[in-house]
From Swiss-Prot:
PANTHER family: GAG_P30 DOMAIN-CONTAINING PROTEIN (PTHR33166). A zinc finger (CCHC-type) spans 490-507. GO terms for cellular component: host cell late endosome membrane; host cell plasma membrane; host multivesicular body; membrane; viral nucleocapsid. Keywords: Capsid protein, Coiled coil, Host cell membrane, Host cytoplasm, Host endosome, Host membrane, Host-virus interaction, Lipoprotein, Membrane, Metal-binding, Myristate, Phosphoprotein, RNA-binding, Viral budding, Viral budding via the host ESCRT complexes, Viral matrix protein, Viral nucleoprotein, Viral release from host cell, Virion, Zinc, Zinc-finger. Residues 408-455 form a coiled coil. InterPro entries: G_retro_matrix, G_retro_matrix_sf, Gag_P30, Retrov_capsid_N, Retroviral_Gag-Pol_poly, Retrovr_matrix, Znf_CCHC, Znf_CCHC_sf. A lipid is attached at G2 (N-myristoyl glycine). SMART domains: ZnF_C2HC. GO terms for molecular function: RNA binding; structural constituent of virion; zinc ion binding. This is Gag polyprotein. Residues 106-197, 420-490 are annotated as: Disordered.
Amino acid sequence: MGQNNSTPLSLTLDHWKDVRTRAHNLSVKIRKGKWQTFCSSEWPTFGVGWPPEGTFNLSVIFAVKRIVFQETGGHPDQVPYIVVWQDLAQSPPPWVPPSAKIAVVSSPENTRGPSAGRPSAPPRPPIYPATDDLLLLSEPPPYPAALPPPLAPPAVGPAPGQAPDSSDPEGPAAGTRSRRARSPADDSGPDSTVILPLRAIGPPAEPNGLVPLQYWPFSSADLYNWKSNHPSFSENPAGLTGLLESLMFSHQPTWDDCQQLLQILFTTEERERILLEARKNVLGDNGAPTQLENLINEAFPLNRPQWDYNTAAGRERLLVYRRTLVAGLKGAARRPTNLAKVREVLQGPAEPPSVFLERLMEAYRRYTPFDPSEEGQQAAVAMAFIGQSAPDIKKKLQRLEGLQDYSLQDLVREAEKVYHKRETEEERQEREKKEAEERERRRDRRQEKNLTRILAAVVSERGSRDRQTGNLSNRARKTPRDGRPPLDKDQCAYCKEKGHWARECPQKKNVREAKVLALDD
């Protein structure tokens, strides 16, 4: 150690890429600046013995973690950082010095000295028991002790200077609620990112017997991550309902784990609604919801039951409890009946029909007392799907022959055909451009036709006016020249006398007769 003055903090900063990978595996995000600030400035002020240079001492880490996770006066922004510190201490990477690893594999109660690189100090008693789960609300369940894991490698020996079995538990379920207190050499154990409260630990003891299960509780990091990444149940029930439904199927939580999930992820009012709805959905012997108090308490107890998950009866009880809890979640997610909310669910311009149908069915579940997956509700859902689809899909579906014989799946397939045949953005722009040009040409033609009609009307009106004034020829009307006044209707153009016209003028007749007499003579 004389040539190496590295501290736990400097080691983590020098290998920051590995530390960040650990955080990613734990589903949390950390930053290098805050990591250094919390370690050197924040945590030493908690008064639990955290040194500014950091430590891998589990008892000190648990003490800091207890303060960070306090309901009042806690530090939620520091949760990811202390969780990663704990993971580094419990599963140290290769770059942690051997002296630090010795302190890691020891239990917090048996840790005698400070971390490597610091002078020895008088041993201080442990502040908090190392086996306390920070988010546990009550004592561990009185489940029977799990069998020793047969898959553990027998060749792995104890660390130097350590008793063979003085600090290693017989398994993660043997008297502890922490799922990570295991030797770093145990590579056969579950990965820290996998959370399965009940896990198979070996083959059945009998040929047709049950596979033995071992208990591993949820980690605080995962509970924190679930709470942070999901909206509240009152705001969007689908998020937490889907999460718990998945957990019930894949993780097989115990009764205590279910209470922990309810306590962390839901408010008091939400928990009461969920439990009330769940007890309404307890099934009787006939498969219908029962109102018998004894059957309800037996299937969905409010107090911790004595169920052994390593027996067939206990597993069946847990299975019924989980199913009933999921039914309670779905029942509590329903709002007062409001069909107007269902009609507000419209398909988006680029939304696939299958996604739209899922949103529509979720609205039915939330705002109506009906189950849209039931056979009797298929027609109503189908009509809503057609009427609230995008205009092009709606037009296609309404033209289908024998529409009453189509199922929801058939309608979705027909809608998918229209959806996938839609033109691209470039094609749409080109089509709109051509349509605009065609509209412009039609408008020009209409304007030309209107102008032609106007000119024809003007010419026709002018000809009609000419006919009314007596000018029936194609010649232009003669207008008075040299300032001569026009003649009246009964005025003679020859003698300008009134009462006769020029062809009847007596003066003009006398002149013609005189000329004729002159020729005869």
